[in-house]
A protein has these predicted regions:
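Catalytic binding pocket for nucleotide-activated donors in carbohydrate/polymer assembly enzymes
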Residues: 187-248
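Boundary detector for helix-to-coil junctions that initiate low-complexity/charged tails
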Residues: 279-369
Length: 369
């Protein structure tokens, strides 16, 4: 089978690499389409609108709305599946246009609910986030107390990141990739489980704590996003839960990761590919223009997100500077009080010295006449 993976900019990279490798292991030919011209990573065979497009792939597996629309235009009769990688950004949702995609793959129940809430009904395929258990080897026995932590918080606010840094510093835990525990969300948690490390779910919207066998189903259904339970992750809570670290979480996590085996994921994808049939008619819509609009909207959303992060960082820095300024002012006032006290003491000492000298003169020369 010839499979064309559709992307706008080769994202999400780790998923593309994992799926491509395991489909190719089974003898299938895989190319990755990138709407944006980008350098081709060694692990992927990248094609674009202007170069090396396959003549007639058997199936298209798109990872975002822009790629789905553009490839539906380029291959009007080729069946297409769509992978929804999250519920936060609209670009991850399938196009709300009948006939563009035949099936939608979701990786957690939360995202599935988001897709079902959209106007266009979709047939969903529920898979788990894959991890390459052949490539990732368990690190071995964990220590009784954690000494090193890996923090994977891409896109998390400075405030939330700061809580983690303060907690780890208070617990005397160093930052190191060769860690005993991992704090993160999504695929970072799945990889931590596969590595046999203790995994703590923590993101911008909350923290759900340690991934244990008892809580795995709840946290996996939520996509390890940190939003499974409505609770606030304060410094005090995170610091207290860090004390619940258990070295047994390592081997237990490796066992839980078996449910995310990339080999099984590839086989489930192929079964879904076999089920879809070619379109009988092309989609009657200006697909290329819609793809352009989606691309511009996604770019605007990214810029807005970047500006929001920068504004938040600026506010955080302004708060820090205000606190530092207040501390400097308080210190200056304290120093001014100390200087004033020293001046008073000096004046008193000078007055006493003058009195002493006067007494000495009186004793030596007698009273003035």
């Amino acid at each position: 089978m010839e499979v064309l993976l559709g992307t706008s900019a080769l994202e999400p990279r780790s998923y593309l690499v994992t799926v491509t490798e395991h489909l190719e292991r089974l003898g299938h030919e895989v190319r990755v389409f990138s709407a944006e011209p980008l350098p081709s990573p060694e692990e992927l065979r990248v094609v674009g609108v202007e170069r090396d497009l396959p003549l007639a792939p058997d199936v298209i597996y798109s990872q975002d709305a822009e790629a789905a629309l553009l490839l539906a235009h380029l291959y009007p009769l080729t069946p297409q599946l769509f992978a929804t990688h999250g519920d936060r950004q609209d670009v991850w949702l399938p196009p709300q246009l009948a006939g563009v995609v035949a099936r939608v793959v979701v990786f957690d129940d939360r995202t599935g609910e988001r897709v079902r809430a959209a106007a266009l009904p979709q047939q969903l395929i529920r898979l788990r986030r894959p991890v390459d258990l052949d490539r990732i080897v368990a690190r071995g026995e964990l220590p009784d107390r954690p000494a090193k932590a890996r923090v994977q918080l891409d896109g998390v606010s400075d405030y939330r990141r700061g809580i983690v840094q303060r907690v780890l510093a208070d617990a005397r835990i160093e930052l190191d990739d060769d860690a005993d525990l991992v704090l993160g969300r999504g695929s970072a948690v799945v990889e931590a489980l596969a590595e046999g490390r203790a995994a703590y779910v923590y993101g911008d919207d909350g923290g759900d704590g340690w991934v244990t066998p008892e809580r795995y189903e709840l946290l996996e259904a939520d996509g390890f996003s940190g939003r499974a339970e409505p609770s606030a992750t304060t410094f005090e809570r995170l610091r207290a839960e860090l004390e619940d670290y258990d070295p047994a979480l390592g081997p237990a996590g490796r066992e839980l990761a078996q449910a995310h085996d990339a080999r099984a994921h590839a086989q489930e994808l192929l079964a879904a590919f076999d089920e879809v049939k070619p379109r009988r008619d092309p989609v009657d819509a200006p697909l290329r223009e819609l793809a352009r609009v989606v691309r511009l909207e996604a770019a605007a959303a990214r810029r807005a997100h970047t500006h929001a992060r920068e504004a938040e960082s600026a506010r955080t820095r302004a708060t820090e500077l205000e606190r530092e300024l207040a501390e400097v002012r308080e210190r200056n006032e304290q120093l001014a009080r100390e200087v004033e006290e020293l001046r008073r003491q000096a004046e008193e000492a000078a007055a006493l010295e003058e009195q002493r000298l006067e007494r000495q003169k009186s004793r030596r020369f007698g009273p003035r006449r």
